[in-house]
């Protein structure tokens, strides 16, 4: 456990706790190495790095309020009521602690476990990276009744040399205050980013997620660019991750009223690992496990998820044996049966996090698995044995037994899906027009709505690297079906075979035949429905294709503008307005479907990599995506109708993150 001496050391967070590792020179040269991209995702990553510093104060018990404000000029303010960045003079660098944190890469109290027990920052480099990539940064620290301020700016000198994150003047005391904490204002540099406009909904969703993960902490969000009711929002969840699971299951039918919740700790001092788990089964067929470490979403899972799954399987099999649900002669049920319809949130707090790869989305610490397994075994077992919870335990076991029967029914269908030789005579033959290229990294698969458009696409494509799979009917809504029903559907089976990866538990990314999978559908309600059905299929059964960046949506033009022999295509209403501004004597054609374009037009506008627009499908907020898929594709009609009425605009593309040529 965390000792009193340890807690005292953490309260005594001072300038001496700041460790310096290297300088800041490379950030402007290669920003992608630090924030991933200079597009929308990288822009928001800047905000997350400052927010996570504030959240770390809350996670370690030193702050209760975190607020974010987006101003009309696109500058952003992040404020907390924590301890405040140390303002004393650093012994080695002879400048204030604030200046060290914002000008030195790998500088901060997070490298010292006495200052932070748990930290979710970008290996401590976040503040300095934000400074390097901003037009200006202003930091105010309120501590000990005094207010301190320092401003940094980035500028180009007369010789054209760029200077990034330079202090305008040293940290100065500017007044007295009753406040406590840190306030950071920054303006992302438009010389670095493709856009400096933060997406209000992206920010709100992430702050809501953080509020669920940090029980009792208030997150305030103000967007001064807005004038509607969404200008000011506030999130606080006294139920923490229990409320989170209730939100995730809000459009589903739970099997028991209240989520199961337990918490435990393993290890002491800097080796302490705190585990929080909330879980609830519903009557659906897919498992939805959301894992986090120090508030960081681990969308690819890792050792903590593995530990949760293995312990849950053992605890439930032991329960089924004790209660006679499983006889002595019966084999134990596999974990997937106990996880059918499960919604769970697994949240860890630990120091010295180790991630696999550079994305920080898969936890690699072996001790995390051991801790989670032990805590699940110790905490879940007595919950199930409590007579008050007999209905709950029976519901989980009954669900698993039914899943086992369905799994056996699906075994033959799964085998067929895996064995190419048995599927070569399936409906796929004569349907897929494959490409001649044998390099998956270069090959593209277009999944096209309708035989008519599919025929034009087959004629217009570059058959060296582009394959065409027309859909003759609507794919199955997999949200409402078990896997054996999915495998019986011709359209789904054709897609599975074309991809080559298998699905679900049998998915193997290394077998992917096409590294770009492009959905082509009409720009109308039917086309939107088909896109939704396909994306639901990919999300539920081949999620790694989305997280790996392999799934795209093609953006065919909405309009053809012709004046004389000159033809121009417009992909949305705004582009049409720009093209036709001041133009006279033109003819306008509104495309109602892909089938209205001949092969040459389809190649020129939609297939040709030199001209086309693609939208990459990404998962920025896994929990929100889960909620939305359930809302739009699940059984409950009223909330779906309400959402579509409020949000649907089938010609909008600006909600997508990046267009890719």
Label every PLM stretch briefly:
Residues 101, 107-113, 164-166, 308, ...:
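Surface-exposed acidic, glycine/proline-enriched linker/cap segments
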């Amino acid at each position: 456990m965390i000792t009193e001496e340890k807690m005292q050391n953490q309260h005594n967070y001072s300038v001496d706790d700041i460790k310096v590792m290297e300088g800041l020179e490379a950030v402007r040269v290669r920003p992608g190495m630090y924030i991933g991209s200079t597009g929308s995702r990288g822009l928001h990553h800047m905000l997350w790095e400052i927010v996570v510093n504030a959240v770390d104060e809350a996670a370690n018990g030193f702050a209760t309020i975190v607020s974010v404000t987006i101003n009309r000029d696109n500058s952003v303010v992040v404020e907390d009521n924590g301890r405040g960045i140390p303002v004393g003079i650093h012994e080695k660098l002879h400048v204030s602690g604030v200046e060290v944190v914002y000008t030195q890469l790998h500088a901060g109290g997070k490298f010292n476990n006495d200052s932070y027990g748990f930290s979710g920052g970008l290996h401590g480099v976040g503040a300095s990276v934000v400074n390097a990539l901003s037009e200006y940064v202003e930091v105010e620290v309120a501590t000990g009744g005094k207010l301190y301020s320092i401003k940094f700016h980035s500028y180009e000198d007369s010789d054209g040399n760029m200077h990034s994150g330079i202090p305008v003047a040293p940290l100065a005391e500017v007044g007295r205050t009753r406040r406590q904490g840190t306030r950071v204002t920054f303006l992302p540099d438009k010389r670095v980013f493709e856009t400096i406009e933060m997406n209000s909904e992206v920010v709100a969703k992430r702050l809501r997620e953080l509020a669920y993960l940090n029980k009792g902490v208030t997150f305030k969000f103000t967007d001064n660019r807005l004038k509607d009711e969404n200008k000011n929002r506030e999130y606080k969840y006294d139920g923490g991750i229990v409320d989170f699971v209730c939100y995730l299951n809000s459009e589903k039918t739970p099997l028991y009223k209240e989520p199961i919740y337990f918490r435990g700790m393993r290890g002491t001092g800097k080796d302490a690992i705190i585990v929080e788990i909330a879980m609830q089964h519903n009557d659906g067929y897919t498992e939805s496990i959301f894992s986090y470490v120090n508030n960081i979403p681990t969308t690819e899972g890792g050792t903590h998820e593995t530990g949760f799954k293995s312990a849950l399987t053992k605890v439930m099999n032991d329960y089924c044996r004790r209660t006679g649900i499983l006889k002595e002669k019966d084999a134990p049920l596999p974990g997937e049966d106990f996880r059918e319809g499960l919604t769970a949130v697994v949240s860890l707090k630990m120091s010295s996090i180790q991630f696999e790869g550079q994305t920080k989305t898969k936890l690699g610490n072996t001790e995390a698995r051991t801790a989670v397994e032990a805590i699940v075994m110790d905490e879940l077992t007595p919950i199930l044995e409590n007579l008050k919870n007999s209905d709950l335990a029976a519901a989980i076991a009954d669900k698993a037994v039914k899943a086992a029967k369905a799994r056996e029914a699906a075994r033959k269908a799964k085998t067929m899906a895996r064995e190419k030789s048995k599927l070569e005579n399936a409906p796929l033959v004569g349907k897929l027009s494959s490409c001649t290229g044998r390099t998956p990294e270069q090959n593209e698969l277009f999944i096209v709505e309708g035989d008519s458009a599919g025929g034009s696409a087959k004629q217009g494509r570059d058959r060296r690297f582009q394959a065409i799979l027309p859909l003759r009917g609507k794919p199955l809504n997999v949200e409402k079906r078990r896997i054996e029903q999915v495998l019986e559907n011709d359209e789904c089976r054709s897609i599975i075979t074309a991809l080559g990866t298998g699905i679900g538990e049998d998915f193997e990314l290394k077998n992917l035949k096409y590294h770009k999978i492009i959905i082509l559908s009409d720009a109308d309600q039917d086309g939107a429905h088909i896109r939704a059905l396909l994306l639901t299929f990919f999300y539920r059964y081949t999620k790694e294709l989305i997280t790996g960046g392999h799934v795209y949506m093609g953006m065919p033009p909405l309009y053809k503008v012709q004046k004389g022999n000159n033809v121009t295509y417009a992909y949305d209403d705004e582009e049409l307005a720009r093209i036709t501004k001041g133009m006279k004597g033109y003819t306008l054609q509104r495309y109602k479907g892909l089938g209205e374009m001949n092969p040459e037009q389809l190649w020129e506008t939609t297939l040709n990599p030199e001209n086309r627009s693609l939208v990459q499908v990404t998962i920025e907020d896994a929990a929100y995506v889960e909620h939305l898929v359930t809302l739009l594709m699940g059984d409950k009609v009223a909330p779906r109708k309400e959402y579509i009425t409020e949000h649907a605009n089938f010609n909008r593309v600006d909600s997508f993150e990046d267009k890719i040529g």
